[in-house]
Amino acid sequence: MFEKAVYPALEELQQPLSQEQFRILKDQLNSEEPTPSAQTKFNYAWGLIKSNHHKQQEYGVQILTELYKSEKSMRREVLYYLSLGSLKIGDYTNAKRYVEALLEIEPENQQARGLLKTIDDKITTEGLIGIGIAGGALAVGLGLIGALVRKNRK
């Protein structure tokens, strides 16, 4: 998903937890029901984001969003992982918004700066790919129109 990672957190994010590790997080969450601690929810969300399954990654981002709203003391950590999770699911707009919010709190945070650079690079790459696809589609369309015009002249 990511080329050579700017920093270790991106590389680590690509490695899902083992089934056993994930089961431990889920068991901890279940053992604390009906009101699991914020840290337990955070750990579970982190495990979900590391997953290779898009729905689990989205659920992890959802849990972190809820934690951001309810746990003021965890906002710094939550913003960082919200940004990572959003990046992983391809939601670059929110990924950038979250990391920029973190940089407002901690302007010298090198991890956040590296993450912002990675997000900006992904946005640029995706934009160029989109332009290339649109340009290719336009060329094919113009070619077809040209062929039809030539055919109708005969």
Swiss-Prot record:
Q: Where are the transmembrane segments?
A: 129-149
What SUPFAM superfamilies does the database record attribute to this sequence?
A: TPR-like (SSF48452)
By its UniProt entry, which CDD domains does this protein fall under? Fis1 (cd12212)
Q: Name one GO biological process term.
A: mitochondrial fission
Placement of TPR repeats on the sequence = 76-109
The protein's superkingdom reads Eukaryota
Keywords in alphabetical order: Membrane, Mitochondrion, Mitochondrion outer membrane, Repeat, TPR repeat, Transmembrane, Transmembrane helix
Q: Which GO terms describe its molecular function?
A: lipid binding; molecular adaptor activity
Q: Per the record, what ranges lie on the membrane's Mitochondrial intermembrane side?
A: 150-154
Identify the Gene3D superfamilies for this entry.
Answer: Tetratricopeptide repeat domain (1.25.40.10)
Residues spanning the signal sequence: none
Membrane topology field: Single-pass membrane protein
Q: Which segments does the topology annotation call Cytoplasmic?
A: 1-128
User: Where is this protein localized, as stated in its record?
Assistant: Mitochondrion outer membrane
- GO cellular component terms, A-Z: mitochondrial outer membrane; peroxisomal membrane
Q: Which PANTHER family match?
A: MITOCHONDRIAL FISSION 1 PROTEIN (PTHR13247:SF0), TETRATRICOPEPTIDE REPEAT PROTEIN 11 TPR REPEAT PROTEIN 11 (PTHR13247)
What's in the domain note?
A: The C-terminus is required for mitochondrial localization, while the N-terminus is necessary for mitochondrial fission.
Q: State the family named in the UniProt similarity comment for this chain.
A: Belongs to the FIS1 family.
Primary role:
Has a role in mitochondrial fission. Has a role in outer membrane fission but not matrix separation.
Q: What is this protein called?
A: Mitochondrial fission 1 protein
